[in-house]
């Protein structure tokens, strides 16, 4: 998919990187991908690829429900792993992944671009300008191109719970990840959402409680929103145009209208 193409293009900007192999379920698809990107070796068995001395690290961009299994397999053979978001289907699987990485002495990283965006560093740098922070609000609502098919009775992968898909796993995570990166683990969580007939969440809203601060996230694959993300402090606000890939960050200082206002 496009994301994999972007990752490869970005990685090739580093002269230390060499793309040596690809693994796919069929030889035909492996050959097609290898030809597209100039990859010398192909595999149809992930275990065989994980055992290969040709490889130092693996990028995993498979369906969500196999992320943990495949990451653990690769790490068990001493390979570093960059795994697409979401890391896994649940917290138990994530713990198993982290434990395997620690045991094997390898690097395990989630491919979450939003907190690696240069503008996210700007946000972190200027949090102090906000004074005491009182609220984090983030919204990522994007009508899915696959939802019209869903309403026609054609259920594509994006709306299949058995693949660990759904709105939170696909795009809601982009609103949560920066929040935790900036403010840590919340004290309390309350959530509500709309569940589609297949069992996946189509959209949702989650409230988080921190010491002296509230956080709210909105996410959807069945409706659009143009709302930006905002971090509100007693001395001003930071406004991010898009939480998943931030292009602009604006600081709006609190205006003192008059004494007692």
Question: Across the structure, where does each feature detected by a protein language model lie?
Answer:
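N-terminal Rossmann-like dinucleotide-binding module
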Residues: 1-37
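Beta-loop-alpha module in the N-terminal Rossmann-like domain of NAD(P)-dependent dehydrogenases
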Residues: 7, 37-100
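Short active-site oxyanion
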Residues: 18-21, 56-58, 108, 165-166
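Rossmann-fold dehydrogenase core element
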Residues: 95-113, 132-136
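Contiguous beta-strand/loop segments that form the cofactor/metal-binding neighborhood of enzyme cores
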Residues: 175-248
């Amino acid at each position: 998919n496009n994301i994999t193409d972007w990752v490869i293009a970005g990685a090739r900007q580093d002269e230390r990187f060499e793309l040596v192999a690809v693994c796919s379920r069929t030889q035909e698809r492996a050959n097609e991908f290898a030809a597209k990107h100039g990859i010398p070796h192909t595999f149809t068995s992930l275990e065989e690829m994980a055992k290969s001395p040709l490889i130092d690290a693996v990028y995993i961009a498979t369906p969500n429900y196999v992320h943990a299994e495949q990451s653990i397999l690769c790490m068990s053979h001493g390979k570093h792993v960059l795994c697409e978001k979401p890391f896994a289907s649940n917290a138990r699987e994530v713990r198993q992944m982290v434990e395997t990485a620690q045991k094997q002495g390898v690097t395990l990283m989630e491919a979450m671009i939003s907190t690696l965006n240069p503008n996210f560093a700007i946000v972190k740098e200027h949090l102090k300008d906000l004074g005491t922070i009182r609220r984090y609000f983030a919204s990522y609502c994007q009508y899915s191109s696959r939802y019209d098919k869903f309403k026609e009775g054609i259920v594509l992968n994006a709306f299949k719970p058995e693949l660990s898909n759904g709105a939170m796993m696909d795009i809601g995570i982009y609103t949560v990840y920066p929040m935790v990166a900036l403010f840590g683990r919340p004290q309390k969580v309350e959530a509500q959402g709309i569940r589609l007939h297949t069992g996946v969440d189509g959209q949702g809203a989650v409230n988080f409680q921190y010491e002296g601060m509230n956080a709210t996230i909105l996410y959807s694959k069945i409706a659009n929103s143009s709302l930006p993300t905002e971090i509100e402090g007693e001395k001003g606000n930071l406004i991010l145009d898009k939480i998943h890939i931030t292009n602009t960050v604006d600081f709006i200082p609190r205006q003192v209208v008059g004494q007692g206002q």
